[in-house]
Structure formats: C-alpha cells, structure tokens
C-alpha cells in the first residue's frame, strides 16, 4: 500500500479551518487537522510546498518513520507551523491505520482506560452576573466543570469574553490585528470576586477553571494563586508566559492552586522542566499543534511519571477532526485529567460529520473505524477562507503586552 495523493482543504464555516486529506492507492483515506489560528495559510504553504510532495509513494502504515522523516529531515525542527503540518499528516495516517485495522482509534492505541471523557465548557459574561447565567446554562446541560471568564471594570475588552451576550467568543475577527487594552491591577482586584460568586451560587461540587492567558508576571501569578486557594479551583491556566520554564518555581512555592499550561507548546522540550520538576499539574498541549498523536503520546507518557495529567486544548480554533482524535486519545491515555470543549457552529458540524457524542458533561468518541470524523468537501467549498488575525494587547500606558 502506498500514498497516492494528498491535498489541503481550507474552509470557514464560522472560522478558518485547515484539513489535510491523504488517500492511498487502495482507496482508503484519512484526514488530519492543520489549523493554526491566525496563521492558517502559513501551514497550507508548508504542507503544499514542502510536505505533500515527499509523502507520495510512501507506505502510510509506517506512521513513526514518516513522523521522524518530517521532523528530523526538515532540519528546522519544532515551531508551530512545522509541528502543525506534521500533526496533520500524523493524525491522517493514524486514521488510515485504524480504518485498515477495522477498529476505533482508541482501540488501536491500547484500548479504553475509561468509559467516558469529562469535558469543561466556557462560561463568559460582560460582568459577573451575566457570567453566572452562562454557568447556569452549562450546569443545566450536565457539565461538571466550567471555565469562567468575565469582563473587568475599566477594561474595554477582556480575554475570553464575547462582545455580545450569548455569542461564542471568537478572538480572530478582523483583517488586521485588533489592539486591546490590559490592566493587571484591575484584573487582580476583580477576578477573585468572580470565583467567590460562582462558589456562592453553585457550591463546591462544580469544578471551576480559569484562563489568565499569559498576562501576569511570576510574582503576580503567585499572588493570584495564593488569594484564590479558598475557592478550590480545578486549575489556573497559563498564568504567566513560560519561555523561562523555571519561572513556575516561584509560583509553585507560594500556592497550592493547581496549575495548567501548554496550549502553545509543540514539543516535549517546551515542557520537560515543568513536568519533571512537578511545577504544573496539567499539560495543555494539543494534538494539532504538538506533532500529532505520535508526539503527544510521548509527552503524556513522560508526564505520567511525574503525576502530571492531561488537559488538552480544545477550543474552536481547532476543527472537529482534532476533537475526534483527542477524544480517542483521552479515552485511552492513563493519566487523563480533563478535555476542553467549545461547541462548533452548526455549519462546522455539517462540514465535519462526526461519531463523537456529548451526554451529561461527558463525551464518548464513537466506535467507527478511525477517529470517527470526516469532511464533506462540497459543503466545505461553500465557506471560503476569510482573513482573520488574533489581537494584540497594550497596557494602559501603551506598552505592548502579552495577549
């Protein structure tokens, strides 16, 4: 069996999504997610110009060998564009391999470690009261865990908060990057009130998560983690940038609030120190940006040695193809923690028919051979690419800051 063809499909049924489709000479095909939010065309070019020509004629069942070929052979290793492209190939090949075996992907990985996968949803609001209403909607749907974000008085835009009530949060929404304003002081003074309100309204049984989105310095993050210990958060996510992984030592020394990070990581090297020194509790890497199933399995296996659990990124900047693959991985991986979930648009679900199902706060991946997600190319063609870039942040004095 050999790879006969491969092509990239770009569609925008709500936001830009990139899919790689690989077909064998026996007619079996697999698909992988190649979406890199705000940089989609960079991955398209990398795949079409540098990856696809090298795949033709290769044995699709040699998944590890092809992964090594694309990683080691490129010389310019790692980086979000290259690793997203490799991930797309890798997931498509695992999809093919599972289809050839006639089994769902989780079975090929080693079988079930659990019957269902706990997910957390996103509740946002322009203020605390409106955020509580969104939390209530999630609880009524059966969610056991909810990420909470709300507007901060005095800041016109806040990460994770929709511009309009009831609308999904989509940060990449303009032809050029929008400029947002940020105040660490206002944020730190306000956000504990949100957690207090959620606990008062919903009690201790609901898991509360929160994303700081790299906005704090280590000492500021330590202060926040210490102040919110009494609210028993499931985790505090991305509280500071970690180009210097050892910065988490300071945070860890000052708080017992569980820490999660990693959605921007694309290799074990990005998080090795964080994991082996037990500076985090959850690794947030994603299959699509961390080199696919082959590579994220290495990260998860390493993390398990140090009692670090998975908590994979799963927002709508990734397609249902990634969600399907992630749910199969989550069903297998022994050190599973939780899976992020944001519902895609109805149009997206039509483009990507899938076998996974939600019920009472949990997902099951389905039992069809492969990862259980397909793409309807005719419907995809109805939604052409639209330029959209992620915002940038400035402090109130005009200094550029982490978005």
Curated annotation (Swiss-Prot):
Cited InterPro entries: D-mannonate_dehydratase-like, D-mannonate_dehydratase_GalD, DgoD-like, Enolase-like_C_sf, Enolase-like_N, Enolase_C-like, Mandel_Rmase/mucon_lact_enz_CS, Mandelate_racemase_C
Keywords annotated in UniProt: Lyase, Magnesium, Metal-binding
Cofactor requirement: Mg(2+)
Catalysed reactions listed for this entry: D-mannonate = 2-dehydro-3-deoxy-D-gluconate + H2O
Binding-site list for Mg(2+): 211, 237, 263
Superkingdom of origin: Bacteria
GO MF: magnesium ion binding; mannonate dehydratase activity
PROSITE patterns: MR_MLE_1 (PS00908)
GO biological process terms held by the UniProt record: amino acid catabolic process; carbohydrate catabolic process
UniProt function note: Has low D-mannonate dehydratase activity (in vitro), suggesting that this is not a physiological substrate and that it has no significant role in D-mannonate degradation in vivo. Has no detectable activity with a panel of 70 other acid sugars (in vitro).
Protein name: D-galactonate dehydratase family member Mmwyl1_0037
